[in-house]
Amino acid sequence: MRTLWLMAVLLVGVEGGVIELTKMIVQEMGKNALTSYSLYGCNCGPGGRRKPMDATDSCCYVHKCCYKKLTDCDPIKDRYSYSWVNKAIVCGEKNPHLKELCECDKAVAICFRENMDTYDKKKKINLKLFCKKTSEKC
């Protein structure tokens, strides 16, 4: 159980309603979010923003920027509700701050699907030793 929780925490940027984000990625991609994206490239998983290696990695970069813009919510602890309607993610929160969090997670799940042709299994477990800092602002 402890190992499962650790893997969940490593998921895309460490933050977010991990359960919700994991489900969104499975629904959009049909892939195991933990094994496919938690350490992908230079931006997925723990750590700061780095120069993206490809479009899939850019999804994680943008996701971290999205979290950075959130106000009045804690992406690590706060949970939100959403539904899967006609193969689409629908954020269902009345709380505008939790809806923003849901929209950040929805965007990264859709970004992964739209850029699945750039996914490179060789980048699936990247220790980030050779990742370059970026001067790009969110």
From Swiss-Prot:
The record marks K128, K133 as: Cationic membrane-docking site (MDoS). Transmembrane segments: none annotated. Belongs to the phospholipase A2 family. Group II subfamily. K49 sub-subfamily. It comes from the Eukaryota. Snake venom phospholipase A2 homolog that lacks enzymatic activity. Is myotoxic and displays edema-inducing activities. A model of myotoxic mechanism has been proposed: an apo Lys49-PLA2 is activated by the entrance of a hydrophobic molecule (e.g. fatty acid) at the hydrophobic channel of the protein leading to a reorientation of a monomer. One of its GO terms (cellular component) is extracellular region. This is Basic phospholipase A2 homolog 7. Its main location: secreted. InterPro entries: PLipase_A2 (IPR001211), PLipase_A2_Asp_AS (IPR033112), PLipase_A2_dom (IPR016090), PLipase_A2_dom_sf (IPR036444), PLipase_A2_His_AS (IPR033113). GO terms for molecular function: calcium ion binding; calcium-dependent phospholipase A2 activity; phospholipid binding.
